[in-house]
């Protein structure tokens, strides 16, 4: 293996090893899941910015939604389906579906994830 490729692989492994969402996927961090598919997990945000604030993540590590779209569009599609299903279940109808890409855009966890946000929660959710 070429030195540059080896360095990139090692950096990627270290990033994944320290990624909080990867630790959630591997069950190293105990989290209450509200949905799980073959390729996604969903849970409530620990610092909600709305009455409903859910996160949907791919189980596979991708730094952001652009990397996910380029490398695994079928998994991105599953993230979107899961987010939409959860919005129907937990919101009264209107919601935001948001991806932050890059620190300047507000991304704080560098593992692709969708935010489902709504101020109108469905009764009982």
Q: For each predicted feature, which ranges?
A:
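HIT superfamily nucleotide-processing domains
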Residues: 2-125
